[in-house]
């Protein structure tokens, strides 16, 4: 489904999906206030430069999965070596909503990826 705004996207989510998305947005706003939240490809994203090709991190949620999207396939492959039981796409890592540990792991990996790309924290 395609959404035209972040508020429209968030209002379409169920409780758990909304919780995870809002937690991630809060994390990014508090730890990386210089990165501007964008709504692109029907998901919240933070670009590391003026254009998406400069690198990005984003998140999306479905009824069964929360997904971290990054601009590096090699970074996703590195995560896969560490946690092969998670679900992987070309530039994304997905978790179910079953454990808090998995969400905290994705938060950690997002922080690491952002820090590598913007040189902070």
Q: What is the predicted function of each stretch?
A:
Residues 1-121:
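Charge-dense, helix-prone N-terminal extensions
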């Amino acid at each position: 489904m395609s959404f035209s705004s972040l508020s429209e996207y968030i209002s379409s989510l169920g409780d758990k999906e909304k919780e995870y998305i809002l937690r991630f947005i809060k994390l990014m706003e508090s730890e990386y206030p210089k990165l501007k939240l964008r709504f692109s490809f029907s998901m919240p994203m933070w670009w590391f430069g003026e254009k998406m090709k400069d690198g990005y991190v984003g998140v999306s949620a479905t009824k069964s999965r929360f997904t971290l999207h990054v601009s590096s396939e090699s970074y996703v492959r590195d995560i896969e070596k560490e946690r092969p039981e998670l679900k992987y796409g070309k530039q994304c890592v997905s978790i179910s909503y079953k454990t808090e540990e998995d969400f905290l792991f994705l938060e950690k990996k997002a922080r690491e990826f952002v820090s590598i790309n913007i040189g902070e924290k």
